[in-house]
Amino acid sequence: TGQNPYSTTGVAEAIVRALGREPVARQPFRDEASMQLAVRALAGEVDAARTALAAAPERHLPQLIGILGYYHAQAATNDAVRRRALTLMELAVPHVPQPRLALETARLQQQLGETAAARQTLEAVLQRHPEH
């Protein structure tokens, strides 16, 4: 329906195609590129998504990926959904300067029984933000 900013251009391009025309080639906007990475990560292409984000962080909004994971974690009713949320949060954390996402990631890792990963995440927060 084009209600989300990152889907508006895709809807517009679909309409152009439905009218028998070809949309002009363009680079995806940062929000679109971020959602494309999230889709890839959730489809099992985590390493490829991680590599793409690391190669061009300026073309993405890692905060958007991270908050998508955070909201999925908050709404999760089972561990399968929590793991999907964690995938997104872990993808974003290295690129989000605020410590809150990393702290929430560590909390979710611990909740899922990934104690070593939680400890590693917290240690990284302390290195980047010793005031915490």
Segments predicted by a language model, with ranges:
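Active-site-adjacent pocket-lining segments in enzyme domains
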Residues: 1-115, 119-131
